[in-house]
Structure formats: C-alpha cells, structure tokens
C-alpha cells in the first residue's frame, strides 16, 4: 500500500477562472505569495496583475482551446481553480430561460469544460483541481433554482471526477458561503445581503484553497466548507 507523503505540495502553475476579481483574485494573490504562477482567465482580465487571458467559460469549445494554449505557453499546468461564477435570483417562472441557462453554463458547464481541457496536463504531474460550489449547493432555498442546480451539480461533478481519476489527480470541492465581493452588486434589496450580513473575507476563503492545493500528495481534501463563524445558512 502506498504511503502518503508528509511534505506539502509546492504551489506551481495554477489556472484560475474568474481570477481578476473576488475569490478568484484572492486565490491568485495567494498563489503568487506562495511562490506559484497564477494564470488568470476572466471576462475582463484587465484588473489582474498576473498573466491574464480574456475568456468566456460559456463558450465551452473556445475555453477548452484557450486552456490548451495557456498550458502550452507555460509548459503545462499544476492546478486549476474554477472560481468563475454568477447568479440570477428569482422565481423559476419569472426568470427568462436564456438568463437561467447562462447561470448553469457559467457555473457548471464552464467548470467542466475548463477541467476537461486541463486534465491531460494535470494527469502528467499529479496536479490538483479545486472546484467552487456554495452553501446553496448543499442547501436549497426559494428563488435560487438556477444557482442551486449549478452548485449541486458542481459537487456531483467533482465527486464523480475524483472517483474517475482514482488518485491520479487531487480533486477538492470548496463550499463557501457569502463573501465580501461584487457578487451581490446590482441586486434588488430583496436579494441583497443586509447591512448586518455575515459575509466572509475572500482572502480567508482563498487561504483554504491554498491549503488544499498544498496538501501532501496521497492525502486529499475532498470537500472543504468555509464561512463566517456566525453564518446562519449552514447546513
């Protein structure tokens, strides 16, 4: 029986979707501070100080080609963090179908496309994948059918990927609650966090991602939940 290493895994070439803002940007900063190389994909990558590429994860074939190009330019990939995500709260019969489906496309189909394209490179180096679900990926609430469907789906996708790859790569699912990011910008008061909402600092959540990326090989963190200590939505 193989013995798991006790040495931390070095942080290397880490591809981060949604990496120019919010949680993704915090992860990119953490990767850089750990001595790794952040490789950012974002709809608007201009705010990122790192190697950054414009890409829309809903263009699944296009994003697969972009991931392949990034891997070629940097001689491979060591890790992927799928932090790109959107939401459109509202009742199912009130949200236009194309808007509802875009939430699924970004959060779930985009995640799968990026991981699919990165997988051959990760398999070569026993790389790691960190997918991003949500506390609403384990707990359903009203007016969140698209978001919950996508985030429940990310958990199912990640568990199946771990079973499929059987230790050839590390697979971790991050399950965060609300964070102090622009995620809630533009929402009506009905769906916006109140002034006393317990939102986590994305840097704190990013530290959990870095912990998973650096965990010793052979000892995998399959799922990790991170939230404010007074978060009421868990479980």
Residue ranges and their predicted role:
Residues 20-21:
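Conserved glycine-rich cofactor-binding loop
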Residues 91-92, 96-101:
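Substrate-binding pocket helix/loop in short-chain dehydrogenase/reductase
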Residues 83-88:
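Conserved NAD(P)H cofactor-binding loop of Rossmann-fold oxidoreductase domains
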